[in-house]
Amino acid sequence: MVNEYDTYNKWLKFFSVRMVQSIIQSRLGDEIESKCVPYSENAVDWFNMRIDELGEISAYLKSNIKSYPPVGTLTLEFLLYTPSGQLLPLEAWILSSSEGTDDCSRNELYHDMSTLLRSAIVSARMTPMHRLYVKKQHLETFVIMYRVFENDISSDMGKGKKTRKIGELVSKFGNISLDLHYRTSMHFEEPEIAPVTPVEDVEEEIDDGEKTVVDENIQTRTVSECVPIADAKKRKASGSVESATSAGSSTSREAAPRFILGQSTSSEDSRHSDVQNSYEEDHKPSLADLRNHSFPFVNLLQSAYNPANGTKKNSSSTCLNSPKSTPEDKEPTIEKVAESFRAAKIDEVVFEEDEDEELPLDSMELSEDSFVHFNQLSDFGGAPSLGNELGDYLKQLKTAPDMTESGDIDICNMDLKTELEKISSQTANFNNFLKHVNSFSDE
């Protein structure tokens, strides 16, 4: 007798697990092929049906359900979840067991359980939820979630709810009953969800001032959290088995995108861009930036070019038609060079007063005493510094031999061979000039 009761409990536990697996898999929207066999050749094929169990559902049941019928009542509930956070209960499958009768003579309980399991699989595909919502699930519209708990207190199905008894099996150990409650009015109403947490010791005040304490024995067990059907579908496609969390719940692994009003993803990524660096890349340095501290005698170039427009001043232009120097000319001394630089300040004042009056090139004849003129003061601060090096350099420039005769050179009518011969004839003079220049460095 004890062995028969243990067998009854074993059959009922495996029936509960197969029923939950079959009904949840019917909500995936995929076609499932279930083949019936005349007898069970494999111990896994319970109730003459081969059902592929999903590891996620098995782990969920293992962590949440501690006792199966006939000890307790098992409830499988499906809810519709919207992106706005609203939950709408759609179905509730309740498997319960009651006391049996001793005069029951039926001994085909195992085959009756197989028939009841097939009836549940067929009924799961005939409900309004399956016809209207199962194949239309989407993350942006709605998803179907499920939860399993150990009591018969399901959520309110709203007005017009219907109840159907899928089947009832009678045995001497107990009567097994499977009931279906489903919604017909698809509108959100309050309250929709049954209490998720058990009620603690609540004190209610009566009009006469007395207090009554609610008995803990009549309180319901903790209701497990909801699990999206889409997660079970993903695990089935990938074939992976994941253990449930300590709370027995599983949330969606796919995070919804975050949208910020008035801000795009590209603007958020580029908000740290450096505007100043982009400006500096496009900025081209001016002439003053390039020439400062780039080569010696920068003040001479400063006097020849105007940094504002980069044009060459007439007063500092060197004419190629200047008269050829004679040996009788005296070399300028350092004192004369200093006087010419000091005179540049006076010339600058006169030049600013008569800035609009430009002098022709022919009227500007160079002399030994005034071979360098500054039209404006240096932008680098103060008057140009004078020294022996600058005076020696100017002497070398004056003593350099002329390579061409005075006069205009007509490049178009020039005979290249003749010009090369002239240059070759001046090679000796140029070599002597180089020796003369090198002698200063040797000293």
From Swiss-Prot:
<dbReference type="GO" id="GO:1902554">
    <property type="term" value="C:serine/threonine protein kinase complex"/>
</dbReference>
<dbReference type="GO" id="GO:0043204">
    <property type="term" value="C:perikaryon"/>
</dbReference>
<protein>
    <recommendedName>
        <fullName>Autophagy-related protein 13 homolog</fullName>
    </recommendedName>
</protein>
<dbReference type="GO" id="GO:0000423">
    <property type="term" value="P:mitophagy"/>
</dbReference>
<dbReference type="GO" id="GO:0019887">
    <property type="term" value="F:protein kinase regulator activity"/>
</dbReference>
<comment type="function">
    <text>Component of the unc-51/atg-13 complex required for autophagosome formation. Required for the degradation of germ cell specific P-granule components such as sepa-1 by autophagy in somatic cells. This ensures exclusive localization of the P-granules in germ cells. May function downstream of the let-363 (Tor) signaling pathway to mediate sepa-1 degradation. Plays a role in survival during limited food availability.</text>
</comment>
<dbReference type="GO" id="GO:0005776">
    <property type="term" value="C:autophagosome"/>
</dbReference>
<dbReference type="GO" id="GO:0005737">
    <property type="term" value="C:cytoplasm"/>
</dbReference>
<feature type="compositionally biased region" description="Polar residues">
    <location>
        <begin position="308"/>
        <end position="325"/>
    </location>
</feature>
<comment type="subunit">
    <text>Interacts with unc-51 (via C-terminus). Interacts with lgg-1; the interaction is direct.</text>
</comment>
<dbReference type="GO" id="GO:0006914">
    <property type="term" value="P:autophagy"/>
</dbReference>
<dbReference type="GO" id="GO:0034727">
    <property type="term" value="P:piecemeal microautophagy of the nucleus"/>
</dbReference>
<dbReference type="InterPro" id="IPR040182">
    <property type="entry name" value="ATG13"/>
</dbReference>
<dbReference type="GO" id="GO:1990316">
    <property type="term" value="C:Atg1/ULK1 kinase complex"/>
</dbReference>
<feature type="compositionally biased region" description="Basic and acidic residues">
    <location>
        <begin position="268"/>
        <end position="283"/>
    </location>
</feature>
<keyword id="KW-0966">Cell projection</keyword>
<comment type="similarity">
    <text>Belongs to the ATG13 family. Metazoan subfamily.</text>
</comment>
<dbReference type="GO" id="GO:0034497">
    <property type="term" value="P:protein localization to phagophore assembly site"/>
</dbReference>
<keyword id="KW-0963">Cytoplasm</keyword>
<dbReference type="GO" id="GO:0000045">
    <property type="term" value="P:autophagosome assembly"/>
</dbReference>
<feature type="region of interest" description="Disordered">
    <location>
        <begin position="308"/>
        <end position="333"/>
    </location>
</feature>
<dbReference type="GO" id="GO:0016236">
    <property type="term" value="P:macroautophagy"/>
</dbReference>
<keyword id="KW-0072">Autophagy</keyword>
<feature type="region of interest" description="Disordered">
    <location>
        <begin position="232"/>
        <end position="283"/>
    </location>
</feature>
<dbReference type="InterPro" id="IPR036570">
    <property type="entry name" value="HORMA_dom_sf"/>
</dbReference>
<dbReference type="GO" id="GO:0005829">
    <property type="term" value="C:cytosol"/>
</dbReference>
<feature type="compositionally biased region" description="Polar residues">
    <location>
        <begin position="240"/>
        <end position="253"/>
    </location>
</feature>
<dbReference type="GO" id="GO:0030424">
    <property type="term" value="C:axon"/>
</dbReference>
<dbReference type="GO" id="GO:0000407">
    <property type="term" value="C:phagophore assembly site"/>
</dbReference>
